[in-house]
């Protein structure tokens, strides 16, 4: 009997286990059933329908049986404690204005009255923006680029205004080679030189919240396809202007190098690197004693730019010429005086023929001089052909004036009244023999010259 009772007990226990695994669990024994993986994810969208916000949740495992499961949110709500989601096929959705957007909320998966799993989330940090729209690409021929523009509904919204956009484009043949550009505006410029010519490209864009709100990337916008134009410039052709400039530049550089090599030692090196003086000569000049008798002038005139020299000759000549111009008559009178009572001239009278020079005192030419004595009684007057050229000096100027006055005085005492005292001008200049020369100066060029022969014949 004992063995039979034990056998029935084991069989009954196995029957309960088999019935539980096959799904025929009794009511109230649900907690003993095997639990499935109920992990889920949620995202929020703010101001999707006017001022209402939406919260969407879904199971990560698509094979989960969602027949008797519900979602419930509690906390961070306005005026209510909890809210239930409504089921739309495989997702659970709630739209309300009662999200506080500050603080955390508790989202739970419930099977009847029992909570299977829960998550603590903040609605403001799980925001998923709406997908951009109106994506277009315009080719600008003048700028050789493509202007990409798109639009988003968040530009007119109150909360999620700051977004970061991800623009992705690829060649049509490269399926997995996407190129991404991140920007905060809704315009993008693609340069033509970075794209392949005569090719088709696909482009799309998505957004993610920035600034205060955090969250996930939005869905991709609908793709847009555009084609790049063919490049008109052929690679084989070369611009002639650019070629000419390049050749001239190369020739100029070569010419400069040749000139630098040729003129390096003679012209360039002395200017860039001047030769240093010999140290021996420098030390010799430093150690050499200066001369004792230095020629130093303390005259203030030596420090002037223009040196002033004293000239007595010009001053004396001006004085004599001024004196003679005052005393010379317009024309010389020709007169002959003879000794009264005899044919032979008296030594005390002057010669019959008076010799004068044709030059006037206004010029700088030399005066004609006649050799003779101051007294006329024993010295004949020479002809003009043998007269000597006499120069007036500044040193004998005053002496000449004195002799002239003396000679005039002596002559006046011996000459008759017919000889005018101022009809002739006598100039005395010493000659080599130390005798004075008597010269009658006249201003008339037509006056006759008395030669030596006529003078002798008359005697």
UniProtKB/Swiss-Prot annotation:
Residues in the Extracellular compartment per record: 21-241
Keywords: Cell membrane, Disulfide bond, Glycoprotein, Membrane, Phosphoprotein, Receptor, Signal, Transmembrane, Transmembrane helix, Ubl conjugation
Motif (Box 1 motif): 272-280
Entry comment on modification after translation: N-glycosylated IL-7Ralpha binds IL7 300-fold more tightly than the unglycosylated form. Ubiquitinated by MARCHF8; leading to lysosomal degradation.
GO cellular component: cytosol; external side of plasma membrane; nucleoplasm
GO biological process: B cell homeostasis; B cell proliferation; cell morphogenesis; cellular homeostasis; defense response to Gram-positive bacterium; gene expression; lymph node development; negative regulation of T cell apoptotic process
Coiled-coil annotated spans: none
Signal peptide annotation: 1-20
Keyword field contains Disulfide bond: yes
Carbohydrate attachment residues: 49, 65, 182
PROSITE patterns per the UniProt record, alphabetical: FN3, HEMATOPO_REC_S_F1
Biased composition (Polar residues): 345-357
UniProt-listed SUPFAM superfamilies: Fibronectin type III (SSF49265)
Domain Fibronectin type-III, residue spans: 131-231
Cytoplasmic side of membrane: 263-459
Domain-level remarks: The WSXWS motif appears to be necessary for proper protein folding and thereby efficient intracellular transport and cell-surface receptor binding. The box 1 motif is required for JAK interaction and/or activation.
Family assignment from sequence similarity: Belongs to the type I cytokine receptor family. Type 4 subfamily.
Role this protein plays: Receptor for interleukin-7. Also acts as a receptor for thymic stromal lymphopoietin (TSLP).
Subunit comment: The IL7 receptor is a heterodimer of IL7R and IL2RG. The TSLP receptor is a heterodimer of CRLF2 and IL7R. Interacts with CD53.
Identification of the protein by name: Interleukin-7 receptor subunit alpha
Organism: Callithrix jacchus
């Amino acid at each position: 009997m004992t063995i039979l009772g034990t056998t029935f007990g084991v069989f009954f226990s196995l029957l309960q286990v088999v019935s539980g695994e096959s799904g025929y669990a009794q009511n109230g024994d649900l907690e003993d059933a095997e639990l499935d993986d109920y992990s889920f994810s949620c995202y929020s969208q703010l101001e999707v329908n006017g001022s209402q916000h939406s919260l969407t949740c879904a199971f990560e495992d698509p094979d989960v049986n969602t027949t008797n499961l519900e979602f419930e949110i509690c906390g961070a709500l306005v005026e209510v404690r909890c809210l239930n989601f409504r089921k739309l096929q495989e997702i659970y959705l709630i739209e309300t204005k009662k999200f506080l957007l500050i603080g955390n909320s508790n989202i739970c998966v419930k099977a009847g009255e029992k909570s299977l799993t829960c998550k603590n989330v903040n609605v403001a940090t799980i925001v998923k923006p709406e997908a951009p729209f109106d994506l277009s690409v315009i080719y600008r021929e003048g700028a050789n680029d493509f202007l990409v523009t798109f639009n988003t509904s968040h530009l007119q919204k109150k909360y999620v205004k700051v977004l970061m956009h991800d623009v992705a484009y690829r060649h049509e043949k490269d399926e997995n080679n996407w190129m991404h550009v991140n920007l905060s505006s809704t315009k993008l410029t693609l340069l033509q030189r970075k794209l392949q010519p005569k090719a088709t490209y696909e482009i799309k864009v998505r957004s993610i919240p920035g600034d205060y709100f955090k969250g996930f990337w939005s869905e991709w916008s609908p793709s847009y396809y555009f084609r790049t134009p063919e490049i008109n410039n052929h690679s084989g052709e070369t611009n002639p202007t650019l070629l000419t400039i390049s050749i001239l530049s190369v020739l100029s550089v070569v010419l400069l190098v040749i000139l630098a090599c040729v003129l390096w030692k003679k012209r360039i090196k002395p200017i860039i690197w001047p030769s240093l003086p010999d140290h021996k000569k420098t030390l010799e000049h430093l150690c050499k004693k200066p001369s004792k008798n230095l020629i130093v002038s303390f005259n203030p005139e030596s420090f002037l730019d223009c040196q002033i020299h004293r000239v007595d000759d010009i001053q004396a000549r001006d004085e004599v010429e001024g004196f003679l111009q005052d005393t010379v008559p317009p024309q010389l009178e020709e007169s002959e005086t003879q000794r009264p009572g005899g044919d032979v001239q008296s030594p005390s009278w002057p010669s019959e023929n008076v010799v004068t020079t044709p030059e006037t005192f206004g010029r700088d030419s030399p005066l004609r001089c006649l050799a003779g004595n101051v007294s006329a009684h024993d010295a004949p007057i020479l002809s003009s052909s043998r007269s000597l050229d006499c120069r007036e000096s500044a040193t004998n100027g005053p002496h000449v004036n004195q002799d002239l006055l003396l000679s005039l005085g002596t002559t006046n005492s011996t000459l008759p009244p017919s000889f005018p005292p101022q009809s002739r001008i006598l100039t005395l200049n010493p000659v080599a023999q130390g005798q004075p020369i008597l010269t009658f100066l006249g201003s008339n060029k037509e006056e006759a010259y008395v030669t030596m022969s006529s003078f002798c014949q008359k005697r």
